[in-house]
Amino acid sequence: MKQYLQLCQRIVDEGVWVKNERTGINCLTVINADLEYDVANNQFPLITTRKSYYKSAIAELLGYLRGYNSAAQFRDIGCKTWDANANENQAWLNNPNRKGEDDMGRVYGVQGRSWQKPDGSHLDQLKKVINNLSKGIDDRGEIVTFYNPGEFELGCLRPCMHTHNFSLLGDTLYLTSYQRSCDVPLGLNFNQIQCFALLALVAQITGHKPGKAYHKIVNAHIYENQLELMRDVQLKREPFPSPQLHINPEIKSLEDIETWVSKDDFIVSGYQCHDPIKYPFAV
C-alpha cells in the first residue's frame, strides 16, 4: 500500500501535463514506476485508502485466461469493465472489423490463447507456459504477451498491461509484468490485484511456491478530472494493513480455470478500508 501511495504522491508532485489524444483529457504524467508484491507472504495489494472491489478484477483476469473476446462473456462472470470500450468507444464503433454489440475484437486474452501465426494456425501462449512450468522447465522465455501491433486494428483497445514473464528459481515461481500505460486512481487497483493473483494462481496449478511479482509501468498518470479527489481526499488518508488472498485449493489445472473456476473461488480476509471514492473513467 505504501508504494502505491508513494507513486500517487510522486505524480502529484512531479507529474507533467500531457493531453491524451484518445480521450481528449489532460493527464498528469510520470515515466517509469516499479512496484513489487510479496505473494510469498500473502501481502495482498488491495487498496485500503478507499473501498476497493477485488472480485471484478479477478473475474477480468479469468476472462483473459480463457481468451474471451466479448463484453457479454465478461459480464457473465461478474465483470463489467469491458462494456464501455466494446460499446461506447467511437473509434471502435466506426471500425469495420467490429462484429456487433459487445465485440471486443482480438485483444488481451485472445492474443494470449490464440496468437495467429503466419501460416494461419494459432499459438496458445498460456498453455505452453503452463505446460513447461508444470514440468519444472524455465526456458527463459516463459512469456505471455497480448501486444500484437499487427492486429491493433482488429481490437477495441491496445493492451495496457501487455506482457507477463514467469521465472522459475528452484521451486519458487516469480512474475514480471509489463504495462505501457496506467490510469493510477482507477486502473492500478485492478492491475495490482491481477499481478498478484496471476502469480499465486499459476504457482498453485504448476506445483510451485510463489515468490514476488514485479510490476513495471512506463506511463503512469492521473487524469485531470481525477486529480482533486486523489490529492485532497485519498492521499490524506492513512492506509490500513494489507489483507490476504485465499484461493480455492481445488483449483489444480488450466482446464479447471477454463471450465468451472469463478471469482467466488477467491476470498479476501482481514480487509479494512476507508469510504469509497468515485473516480471518473475515461473511455
Curated annotation (Swiss-Prot):
Top enzyme category: transferase
EC code(s) of this entry: 2.1.1.45
Binding sites annotated in the UniProt record for dUMP: R22, R180, S181, C182, D183, N191, H221, I222, Y223
Disulfide bonds: none
Pfam families tied to this protein: Thymidylat_synt (PF00303)
Gene Ontology CC, one term: cytosol
Biological or metabolic pathway of the protein: Pyrimidine metabolism; dTTP biosynthesis
Annotated active site: C160 (nucleophile)
Biological process annotations from GO: dTMP biosynthetic process; dTTP biosynthetic process; methylation
Keywords: Cytoplasm, Methyltransferase, Nucleotide biosynthesis, Transferase
Keyword Disulfide bond among UniProt keywords: no
Keyword Ion transport: no
Subcellular localization: Cytoplasm
Protein function: Catalyzes the reductive methylation of 2'-deoxyuridine-5'-monophosphate (dUMP) to 2'-deoxythymidine-5'-monophosphate (dTMP) while utilizing 5,10-methylenetetrahydrofolate (mTHF) as the methyl donor and reductant in the reaction, yielding dihydrofolate (DHF) as a by-product. This enzymatic reaction provides an intracellular de novo source of dTMP, an essential precursor for DNA biosynthesis.
NCBIfam families per UniProt: PRK01827.1-4, thym_sym
Family that this chain belongs to: Belongs to the thymidylate synthase family. Bacterial-type ThyA subfamily.
PANTHER family to which the protein is assigned, alphabetical: THYMIDYLATE SYNTHASE, THYMIDYLATE SYNTHASE 1
Subunit structure: Homodimer.
Record's protein name: Thymidylate synthase
Species this chain originates from: Idiomarina loihiensis (strain ATCC BAA-735 / DSM 15497 / L2-TR)
Gene: thyA
